Amino acid sequence: MSRSSQRSTIKDMTNGNPAKLILGFAVPMLMGLLFQQFYSMVDTIIVGKFLGVDALASVGSTSAINFMINGFVIGVCTGFSIPVAQRFGAQDYKDMRRFVANAGWIASCFAVIMTVIVCLMTRQILVWMQTPDNIIDGAYSYIFFVFAGIPATYLYNTLAGIIRALGDSKTPVYFLILSSLLNIALDLLFIVQIGTGTAGAAYATVISQAVSGILCLIYMKKKFEILHMHREETRISGRHIYILCKMGVPMGLQYSITAIGSVVIQTAINSLGSIAVASVTAGQKIGMFFCCPFDALGGTMATYAGQNAGAGKVDRIRQGVRSATLIGGIYSIAACIVLTVFGGVIPLLFVDASETVVIHQAHLFLTFNSLFYIPLTIVNVWRFTIQGMGYSLLAILAGVCEMIARAMVGFLLVPIFGYIIICFASPLAWLLADAFLIPAFFYCQKHLLSEKARMD
């Protein structure tokens, strides 16, 4: 690959208009997230339409534990990419390659250990979560094979994170789109044609993610000369592993700690019966689709803040946060209007019109959540910025705030108020996290400025 071609692939986010850079980076990432949610929705639609409401509830009842485990993987891999982005921003390419190599070693070890432990505990976890008896077998069939595919999740997210750390947010999207289409085709094959039940949805997800990870690996080897390593750069390094774990593990724990609250909520939902589970499943699938822009802005700000922190450009980080928050705020208003008006129609994608209770409850869930999308914007933009700046512990504490809010709702309020309070669990979590993140960001900014002044 020529130097000019490589420069066109890699994006330096330490120079240029912050708003344009953020939009230019976030839009391709958004396309990938939308396709990811699209095939996730297709999974749910096929399960709901072809296998019925109980099967829909079976898959939905695993969403919180799935988020906790796979969220840890995604968080760890995102954290691994931050030292890569910082070294790239500092133009220290040799050290950057050491981080890339050691990220591969750690990801491989984590993948093997997690797969064994989680697969052995899957059934018991579902029992602890009070999964209804009529759906627990379908839930187990689905989530066991999803967890067996944890290595594929590590493969894709580690490599995609490294590619994005170098400023290329488009290529992982292309591979994700391809894997999304493959996932849909495999869903139809396994569920409709072969009749593998809920396990078929898991087969499709794991295979398609493995394909996208392999494509990322091939692309990196062929297209990034800057990542071509000498033998000594591939060796395990205690210093690099420490830094990677210092960034990755806290970010993974951030996801998992947040998800613990979701597990408590899911347990509370399970106690309300399969109709409530199906309602929240439909609402969450739709809501996750509409929340993709917030995730894209967050992922963008991790790279943006990482590169600019590495380059010592603290003022640009503040400008980027302002721009990203404004973009997210404008979108939040539009999304709220759409979900309030049409939230009673979209659930028909997942269930028959005769399931009036499911449709009504899903609409309530979407409406109340969308009213708080501006606080969600702050959670994603400001937390990922703090993470990119290198303050991983503070990002974890924000996750603790979310966990506390959701746990309080699940343990204390659901037994009293029932389904309606489920609709406010996430909004309360976002508000409590914001109360922590806003002052935390200004602390991080002040600390970085003082560090920069001391070094100068």
Placement of each model-derived feature along the sequence:
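Hydrophobic transmembrane alpha-helices of multi-pass small-molecule transporters
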Residues: 68-71, 115, 183-187, 213-217, ...
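Residue-level signal for short hydrophobic patches within transmembrane helices
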Residues: 15, 19-38, 42, 65, ...
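Short alpha-helical transmembrane segments in multi-pass integral membrane proteins
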Residues: 1-26, 84-149, 193-249, 305-372, ...
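Transmembrane helical elements of multi-pass membrane transporters/channels
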Residues: 24-43, 145, 156, 179, ...
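Helix-terminus/linker motif at the lipid-water interface of multi-pass membrane proteins
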Residues: 34, 38-56, 126-133, 189-196, ...
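Interfacial/gating helices of multi-pass transporter permease domains
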Residues: 24, 47-67, 133-138, 198-201, ...
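Small-residue-rich hydrophobic transmembrane alpha-helices
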Residues: 56-116, 153-172, 279-343, 376-398
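Short runs within selected transmembrane alpha-helices of multi-pass transporters and secretion channels
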Residues: 77, 145-164, 172-180, 201-214, ...
